Structures are given as structure tokens and as C-alpha cells.
A protein has these predicted regions:
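Nucleotide-activated sugar donor-binding and catalytic core shared by glycosyltransferases
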Residues: 1-270
């Protein structure tokens, strides 16, 4: 089983079926491997494939030219999500925080458009904003490379920004009923993958009512104004890549499949 069910977060009862039915779980997270091992499943930690794929394809200067980056401005990445309901709920908050930042620092903002979100939809929310905002297409890791800081919705994006060593604040909101049910069913301390990996908050999290423009500004502004504070966070998120292993996840999975299949075949022959 590769990319296994998240028994570490919820529905741990599923582990019994997995233990019964699978020959091997190829785990992408250390804490996931621990959860499956405790459940009695045969498990091997192989690492996350993103550890291999998250890297820029351009030099810094090439990326600056490609995205029309302004060297005289702080470049801030806004990542409101890949679903319309996420973008509708989070982008206005991010834009309000961006307005706050722009009043204190000379900033350039970038929104990488997810393939599921039409550009017209983003522009309808941005409206007639006076902010310097670029909506970008593709080369997301090159864009991360040139940015000073980021505000992102929860999900894989925060793992990607951590692997790119980009200081990020995670924001997310659910409908009140959904949030109530999530608190009943989900049993993890953090929402962000970097924090789950490290067992501590290296990527600040703002959830539900705390996900507001004032709080986002309070976290981002020190990173933008004080390079030493930004570097301190970078040193923390550098540990995320170390926690994910040395890369080569896909090759390890392939080797594991061959070895496991060989072992099973050998037992059958006996």
C-alpha cells in the first residue's frame, strides 16, 4: 500500500483491515510509519516523493526575469488553495493582510493560479485592488525561490514551501459544523504537514477565527522587516527536508515492491 490511509489522523479502526489485507505499507511520513507499526502492520518508511521533485528549474535571476520580480520590493506569495470554496473563503483575508503589509513595506504579491481555478475567478475577488499583484502560471517552485515569505492554505502547499525553505504562515477555515466534527474525529495536534513532521510548530498555523488579516500581518511582518528573524525561521524549516529523508522515495518503493514480491513468491514455492 503506497500513500496509505491516514490512520494516524482519524479512523484508526481501519488499521485492522490493513493489517489483515496488505503485505507491506510503503509509508511516506515517519509518523505514519510509527502509527502503522504500532497497529501491527508490516511497514517501511520510504519518504515523500516531493523530497525529489520540489526544487527550482531556474536560477534565481532567471526566475526573477520570468516572473517580473521587482528587486526593490519584498515579494510575497499568496496561495489560497485549489478549490473554489477555499479561494472564496481565504483569498479576501489574504488580500486584506496584503493591504496591511503594503502600508508598511514596499511589496509585490504573487498568486500562483491552480489549474482548477479560472483566472477570471481570481480577478473577480481581487477586484480593483491597488496592490501590485501578479497572477502566475506554472514554475511554482521557481516562484517560491524568489519570494520573501508566503501565506498558504493548509495542505501539500505548506510541505512544498518548507522544502523550498520559504517562511510560510498556514491559514484555513472550515464551516462551523465541519470544524466541530473534525475536532471529534481527527486526533492530531497540528494541521500542517511540516509541523506534523517536526512535532512542533515551525510553520505558524492560523485556523478558524484566528485566520484573519491582523494575525497574518503580525506573523509575516517580522519576516519581511527583519532578515534575521526570517533566517531563524528558515533554519527551523530546513529540518523538514532532513525529516523526510535523503530523497529517492520512488526508487525505494520500486525496490520494496520487487523485494516484497520476491519474498512472497519464495514463500509460495516452499
Amino acid at each position: 500500500y503506497y500513500i496509505a490511509p491516514t490512520i494516524w489522523a482519524w479512523n484508526k479502526g481501519r488499521a485492522k483491515n490493513i493489517v489483515r489485507d496488505v503485505t507491506m505499507v510503503a509509508s511516506i511520513f515517519p509518523f505514519e510509519a510509527k502509527a502503522y507499526k504500532e497497529a501491527g502492520a508490516p511497514v517501511t518508511f520510504v519518504g515523500h516523493p516531493l523530497a525529489d521533485t520540489v526544487k527550482p528549474s531556474m536560477s534565481f535571476d532567471e526566475a526573477m526575469d520570468h516572473f517580473h520580480g521587482d528587486r526593490d520590493k519584498k515579494r510575497i506569495l499568496l496561495m489560497p488553495g485549489s478549490r473554489k470554496n477555499e479561494v472564496t473563503g481565504l483569498l479576501p483575508i489574504m488580500l486584506e493582510a496584503a493591504e496591511n503589509l503594503a502600508q508598511k513595506e514596499n511589496c509585490q504579491f504573487f498568486i500562483p493560479r491552480a489549474s482548477t481555478i479560472p483566472e477570471s475567478f481570481l480577478r473577480s475577488i481581487i477586484g480593483n485592488s491597488s496592490l501590485c499583484i501578479e497572477i502566475t502560471e506554472g514554475h511554482q517552485y521557481d516562484l517560491m525561490q524568489i519570494c520573501t515569505a508566503c501565506v498558504a492554505s493548509s495542505g501539500t502547499a505548506t510541505l512544498e514551501t518548507a522544502l523550498m525553505e520559504l517562511p510560510t504562515v498556514l491559514v484555513y477555515k472550515l464551516a462551523p459544523v465541519t470544524w466541530f466534527l473534525a475536532n471529534l474525529l481527527v486526533h492530531v495536534k497540528y494541521a500542517g504537514l511540516p509541523n506534523l513532521l517536526m512535532g512542533r510548530e515551525v510553520t505558524p498555523e492560523l485556523l478558524q477565527d484566528r485566520a484573519n488579516a491582523e494575525n497574518i500581518t503580525d506573523i509575516l511582518l517580522p519576516w519581511i522587516e527583519d532578515e534575521e528573524k526570517r533566517k531563524k525561521n528558515i533554519e527551523e524549516i530546513k529540518e523538514v527536508r532532513k525529516a523526510q529523508g535523503s530523497g529517492g522515495a520512488v526508487h525505494r518503493v520500486a525496490r520494496l515492491i520487487v523485494d516484497t514480491a520476491g519474498a512472497v513468491h519464495g514463500r509460495k514455492e516452499k
